[in-house]
A protein has these predicted regions:
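Structured beta->alpha junctions
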Residues: 10-13, 46, 165-168, 199
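N-terminal-biased segments
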Residues: 3-17, 105, 109-116
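Short amphipathic alpha-helix that is part of the acyltransferase structural core
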Residues: 83-123, 239-240
Length: 240
């Protein structure tokens, strides 16, 4: 019951163009209906294959028109170190501010996380076994936690910038950019040469920043789109 997520749909190349994928996807919908599931969603990377094959299939089966879900941004330290904003908002100018390694957060910091208003996807406690201690940082103001940037090692030579949060009253002072810059500078000084991040489509401020200040220094920019199918259960069908 509840909602479902489609994780993978694949048809061998020699067997394509025979509506096998369409029949598989339709069968998934029928099984979910029997299990009283009300909605199924899919998130996928935009490629020539998904544009030519998956999106027409979703349309044919009554899925909602795909919408942008995330922008995936890739860069290297050689490229990003050219960004002028890296030195524009140093945390050393933040009177009363204290930057610390997130891997060393105190129990009081953990308690204060719950007092801040942040979206679930920005949790600093996700994927702890891959936490990158090199440049995961916390930010306090007068001993109160006000933000964090959490990164994860996703490959030997690549760090993912997973979560960036600053309490709302400090955002007008560009403290988020300050934290991001500090983390990037730490990576630039390390042997880890690649970085990646995903920006949610509903994070308007970060999308603007990414397109204006990150995009000129990227090595790759990819889209993830999302589509949903609302499932009408038999018990909810109106009599004719």
């Amino acid at each position: 019951s509840g909602d479902a997520e489609l994780l993978s749909l694949f048809v061998l190349p020699p067997c394509r163009h025979q509506e096998i994928g369409t029949r598989l996807l339709h069968a998934v919908g029928q099984v979910l209906k029997e299990q009283q599931c009300r909605q199924v969603s899919v998130i996928y990377e935009v490629t020539p294959l998904t544009t030519a094959a998956l999106e027409p299939m979703l349309h044919k089966l009554g899925w909602q028109p795909p919408q942008l879900a995330f922008l995936l941004m890739d860069t290297t330290m050689e490229r990003i170190k050219q960004a002028p904003w890296l030195e524009k908002y140093p945390l050393s100018d933040f009177s009363g501010g204290d930057v610390f390694p997130w891997g060393d957060y105190a129990e009081t910091d953990r308690q204060q996380v719950d007092l801040l208003e942040w979206e679930p996807e920005l949790s600093p406690f996700r994927d702890p076994e891959r936490l990158e201690r090199l440049n995961s940082l916390g930010l306090r103001y007068r001993e109160q936690l006000i933000g964090w940037i959490v990164t994860h090692r996703v490959a030997l030579d690549q760090i993912r910038y997973s979560s960036l949060f600053v309490a709302e009253r400090f955002r007008t002072k560009a403290r988020g950019i300050s934290l991001l810059s500090a983390a990037i500078r730490l990576q630039i000084a390390s042997p880890v040469v690649k970085a990646t991040c995903a920006v949610a489509a509903d994070n308007a401020a970060m999308l603007r920043f990414g397109r204006r200040h990150l995009q000129p220094y990227l090595t790759g920019l990819r889209e993830l789109r999302q589509s949903r199918l609302e499932i009408v259960l038999e018990s909810e069908k109106k009599p004719i």
